[in-house]
Structure formats: structure tokens, C-alpha cells
Amino acid sequence: MAKKVTGFVKLQIPAGKANPAPPVGTALGPQGINIMGFCKEFNARTQGGDMIIPVEVTIYADKSFTFILKTPPAAELIKKELGVERGSGQPNKVKVGTITRAQLEKIATTKMPDLNCESMESAVAMIAGAARSMGITVKD
């Protein structure tokens, strides 16, 4: 028989840098799970990375937990690919960079397992939309 699920929490934590302070402690503390146990396991599974990692934590009735690591957000992958610090505050007026089709395909390939799309073409279109909303010019 499967364990009874009592909670489900989504977090975005820098790879290898989970600690009991907020946001981890405030999200997981009320659920009653071992926060240090989560932090140690998360850090072990994400060591050596420098990206923000989305994680989905499932909490069971016996206060045990499991978690699934997702791919980094598209905006983080775009910023890393272009080497920009942040997107534009006025994306329609101020552009912060240019991204090529090859770079979009590379990011879409990385992000594909977590995207809600069937083809690579639609994945590239989703990533291109994220880039445009950050003030990045998409070059075909």
C-alpha cells in the first residue's frame, strides 16, 4: 500500500546551497519534516552547480519526504548562455542582448523534459518568448 501524501511544496533553491533559513525553513517547517535532512540530501544531489534548481517536495503522513529536481528556469538558462546579469526592466524599449536560433535550441534541449510541449519547434518558441520578455532580441 502506498504512503498517504499530506503535503506538496514547490521551491526554487540555488544548487548546493540549501539551508534551514528561509525560504526552505518557512516552507518545510510547518509540514513537520526534518529540514536538515532535506537540506543535506538536496545539497548532495545538486553539488557543483551554480544555477537555481526548482524542487517539488512530497510530504507523507509519517513525516518522511521525497523530492524531484527539475531543470533550471528558462530565464536562468538564457542569462547564463548570454552572460548577462539580469533581464531588461523595459523589455520593449531597452534590449540587453541578442540570442541566436542555435542558442535557443541548446536551451530548449536542456529544458525539454520539463516543458509542456510535444516538438522541439514549440519548445524553441517557448524559450524565444521567455527571451523576448527579458528584453533580449531573438535573431533567426
UniProtKB/Swiss-Prot annotation:
Species of provenance: Gemmatimonas aurantiaca (strain DSM 14586 / JCM 11422 / NBRC 100505 / T-27)
GO molecular function, one term: structural constituent of ribosome
SMART domains named in the record: RL11
PANTHER family in alphabetical order: 60S RIBOSOMAL PROTEIN L12, LARGE RIBOSOMAL SUBUNIT PROTEIN UL11M
Keywords: Methylation, Ribonucleoprotein, Ribosomal protein, RNA-binding, rRNA-binding
Pfam short name (any one): Ribosomal_L11_N
Domain of life: Bacteria
This protein's name: Large ribosomal subunit protein uL11
GO cellular component, one term: cytosolic large ribosomal subunit
Any Gene Ontology biological process: translation
